[in-house]
């Protein structure tokens, strides 16, 4: 996933934006907690949104955060395919 730096001027953290399998991904660094977290949105009729902080998931490195984001999206898509087959 390619990330674009969208950090605002004078911000104490870092903010990046990217896309993965039609999901909009935001990878953020919090200087207060010295950790990375992500939030995603599907921007389509599925209206899927998720923030890793809801489950208290924080990452030590940006790479780990990106990997966690991609794994979450892959899991959502896999579950959607299974439910389509059953329904």
Language-model features, listed with the residues they occupy:
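Short N-terminal "domain-start" leader segments
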Residues: 1-40
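Mixed-charge, Lys/Arg-enriched low-complexity segments
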Residues: 2-7, 44-87
